[in-house]
Amino acid sequence: MEIRYATNPRDFKNYDNERVREDFLINNLFEKGNINMVYSHYDRLIVGGAVPTNSPLHLEDKETLKTEYFLERREVGFFNISNNKGKITVDGEVYELDHRDCLYVGKENKNILIESIDSDNPARFYIVSATAHKNYPTQKKSLQEATHRHLGDDSQSNKRDLYQYIHADGIQSCQLMMGMTFLSENNMWNTMPPHIHDRRMEAYLYFDIDEDEKIMHFMGQPNDTRNIVVSNEQAVLSPPWSIHSGVGTKNYTFIWAMAGENYTFDDMDHVVKNQLK
């Protein structure tokens, strides 16, 4: 597991493009036959990807976590971002995940196996884990069951549908919040005007992006912003002090995940567009 350390916003002002990408962009998450993970010191969030093929993949990393099993002091959310079915076995109980299904697994579940139904057409699982203080029940939720919010409009090029899966009024968790947002056709902006939530960090996974299309992800303090050019199935870590917004060369989908102090989705400090530099 790769480890990423936290960054002071004063130091961030001196980063060149290469350093920004090294610290905040996550690529190569989805590798056939493997689980790849990044441990962030922002709220101890783990971001990962799994593409099981011929044999199940076991969610574990004793060396990094120094625990007997992965969820000894953690909770985790899985999303199947592929069109291929997969399944996750939690201490012997099997959960089948179709396209855009989410599975939450709580603290103290010991044996987590990740599999594809068809090894020739493997599922692609996005994984996010946060620290946990108590056990919440394992629960699966489909896109149709998620809480739906319609946001934006065509005039601002930010018309989008946001689906909340793991949150206060959905799947219960200690601190992990996860959901998925779809940009409508001919709409390319997400989270503009932007906001900051100093109580929580956030991670974005951008996907459903054609090979020759890109996302410009904006980050930094409102008066000192930078951009990261993002390709399909790459993730970005967003510090609590940073805005997080993006625009694509075409519409796209992203999964957002948050962890931190407050468990309220709307706890955010809005930034006026005129403040941006």
From Swiss-Prot:
The EC number on file is 5.3.1.17
How the cofactor binds, per note? Binds 1 zinc ion per subunit.
Q: From the UniProt record, give the pathway where this protein acts.
A: Glycan metabolism; pectin degradation; 2-dehydro-3-deoxy-D-gluconate from pectin: step 4/5
Q: InterPro entries under this entry?
A: KduI, KduI/IolB_isomerase, KduI_N, RmlC-like_jellyroll, RmlC_Cupin_sf
Could you give a GO molecular-function term held by this entry?
zinc ion binding
Q: Which UniProt keywords apply?
A: Isomerase, Metal-binding, Zinc
Q: Which cofactor does it need?
A: Zn(2+)
Q: Name one Pfam family in it.
A: KduI
Similarity-based family: Belongs to the KduI family.
Role, per record:
Catalyzes the isomerization of 5-dehydro-4-deoxy-D-glucuronate to 3-deoxy-D-glycero-2,5-hexodiulosonate.
Q: Which PANTHER family match?
A: 4-DEOXY-L-THREO-5-HEXOSULOSE-URONATE KETOL-ISOMERASE
Its recorded name reads 4-deoxy-L-threo-5-hexosulose-uronate ketol-isomerase
What organism is this sequence from?
A: Oceanobacillus iheyensis (strain DSM 14371 / CIP 107618 / JCM 11309 / KCTC 3954 / HTE831)
The beginning of the lineage is: Bacteria, Bacillati, Bacillota, Bacilli, Bacillales
